[in-house]
Amino acid sequence: MNDIFENTETMKENEHPRFYTAESVMRGHPDKLCDLIADSVLDACLQHDPASRVACEVMATHGHIIVAGEITTSAKPDVFNIVRDTLRDVGYDPKAYQIDCYIHDQSPDIAGAVEPELAEGEDEDTLGAGDQGVMVGYACNETPEYLPMPVVAAQRLVTLLEISRMTGVIPDIGPDGKVQVTMEYNGDTPVRITTVIVSVQHKEDTDINKLADLLDEYVFPLAFDGMPADDAEIILNPSGKFVQGGPDADTGLTGRKLMVDTYGTFAPHGGGAFSGKDPTKVDRSGAYMARYIAKNIVATHLATRCQVTLAYAIGQAEPVMVDVNTFGTCDACEDDCLAAAVRKAYDLTPAGIIKQLNLTNPIYKYTAAGGHFGRKDFPWEKVDNMSDFISYIQ
């Protein structure tokens, strides 16, 4: 993808620089910790009962973890041990937290809307959407991940910080941290990374200058490989000391890092969080499907940028809206033609999405940190044969 920078000098003179910023956070960030616990509870349910209905919320604060929500399942998830195991895996002492659990069954009104006919033996295709909402999927050709470059850079930084901590390469790093990457664009072309902010928890006696040297040696070269970052300003722990972190420093909640989970400021967000929700909740499954469609449109070279927006009504299977926006980068047809092709080529019902993307597999705790998009091992990231789709636009 380095050729994306070749024509920077020849861009039109009237195109003014623009700046975009993307953020990512480590697993020990209090909000992400809550997402991770919620998705671990979801996985425990799906592992034993793929038809589980889960809406799990978590709050983490000083000395306390509270798990609450609506769960209907034949599984018997050990919520307390799930919380303890997650805390230990992230890097916190589970003995330091009192765990409270407030789980009850899904509302019968919601259950009746999602599965109105199943009790009478109807096919699973009658599954209605678990809620109303708007879901957005986005893709572009800036990186091999089909994501904006600063989004990928931020995700890489967090991943490398996690690896450096867990392997002991940089032993002074703590579980909590966040990064921010600002990039200059000329039109739609990324030109250079201008600013990188790294705020990372550390031990009391850590030499910050030595920590900066270790990041320069082990993290930044890999994080920015293939990216124009030579002149980037690196700002490490701008608040100064960062010894106390996680829930001891800030209260965390599920669903508080929506833009970190998706595309930063490059695409709008419908407002529905992902973590802790089973795939009948279109907040999650609809967003995954929208990303899958957008990525395949770009990967097939129908467009260089694509945004797919879906909207659902609770209890109804078919979306009430399908919109495609290629920002003028599709030469094959108009965007309304692409939207019509999406309706014809894909089953956009909750049951159809679940089947297409195999969403009853217990994989969700792996999505909770590092971004839900851009990693090839997730089924909504696969690039498929688009011949059927293309036939609908010809």
Go through each PLM region and give its residues.
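Internal helix-turn-beta structural module
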Residues: 61, 305, 311-394
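Glycine-rich, mobile lid/loop segments that gate access to catalytic sites or pores
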Residues: 21, 63, 81, 88, ...
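Alpha-helical support elements that line or immediately flank enzyme active sites
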Residues: 27-46, 142-159, 277-301
